[in-house]
Amino acid sequence: MGKMIYMDHAATTAVRPEVLDAMLPYFTEKYGNPSGVYTFASKNKDVINVARDIIADSLGAKPEEIYFTGGGSESDNWALKSVVEAFQDKGKHIITTSIEHHAILHTCRYLEKLGFDMTYLSLIHI
């Protein structure tokens, strides 16, 4: 059998060794909740803020424009709901595809219940 080729990087991706090295202490020793009020936690909040500053600087953004989420579904929901909120005075019609990630489709179904008109494009129309 030949070498395995992993083709599902949209779902998960291997962590680079240098990233693992940097994160390992926070998985094993420094795992305090950064939102906690105790010292163990506040140190982690400081580390997160340093990371936020580095990312913002590399993107030419402000640190307060950088948000961290728990994963793809949370990010999808947040992005879609944020766009809806930002453009609520422009109308209530959203166009998406029928093959979107379930996190997007579930949020679209929720928005339909709130009175939004949805158009789901099929692959045939794309």
What are these regions (language model features)?
Residues 1-124:
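Pyridoxal 5′-phosphate
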